[in-house]
């Protein structure tokens, strides 16, 4: 594994730059912050921002002259544009799914129904959590290593293949799943 101990931000890449009207140039990119020594990135991919500048010969470079993603950068001279925080709780009493939700590799609207039973999110099961194709996982990104999570469940499994519950999901091979299921031996 590649790890540079000189930077808290690792795996930087997949970015886009913007030239602002005030002359500033910024780059937003994906990154991760691994926990040492395991180098596990519990919070997954995050978005970072870097102050950039164009060189005289037309190359884009980091304004600080380095090549490592910086955890902290100088502020823009643009006026503040406050962003409303995402709600920490959802009763699913809207007909629209909030922007804080996503699903691995598929559109959550392909398996989530908010209209059939107001106040609930009805998920139509598809493939297992290990699937790379159509796992019905309605996800919300953790933004802190300390969190309290919970869910309410109304589910009656009819087969050993039916499960529903709460999942802490990193990827299709790394997750913790607390679920209700049908046991053929326990009935």
Regions found by a protein language model. Give the residues of each.
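Carbohydrate-active catalytic/glycan-binding domains of CAZyme proteins
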Residues: 1-187
């Amino acid at each position: 594994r590649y790890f540079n101990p000189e930077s808290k931000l690792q795996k930087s890449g997949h970015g886009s730059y913007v030239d602002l009207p005030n002359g500033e140039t910024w780059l937003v990119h994906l990154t991760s912050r691994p926990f040492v020594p395991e180098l596990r990135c519990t919070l997954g991919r995050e978005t970072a921002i870097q102050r950039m500048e164009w060189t005289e010969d037309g190359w884009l470079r980091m304004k600080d002259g380095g090549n490592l993603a910086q955890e902290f950068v100088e502020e823009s001279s643009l006026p503040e544009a406050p962003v409303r925080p995402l709600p920490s709780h959802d009763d699913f009493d809207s007909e629209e799914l909030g922007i804080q939700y996503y699903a691995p590799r598929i559109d959550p609207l392909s398996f989530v129904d908010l209209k059939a039973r107001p106040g609930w999110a009805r998920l139509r099961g598809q493939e297992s959590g290990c699937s790379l194709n159509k796992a019905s996982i309605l996800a919300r990104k953790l933004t802190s290593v300390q969190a309290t999570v919970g869910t309410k469940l109304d589910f009656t499994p009819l087969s050993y293949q039916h499960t529903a519950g709460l999942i802490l999901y990193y990827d299709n091979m790394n997750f913790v799943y607390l679920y209700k299921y049908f046991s053929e031996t326990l009935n």
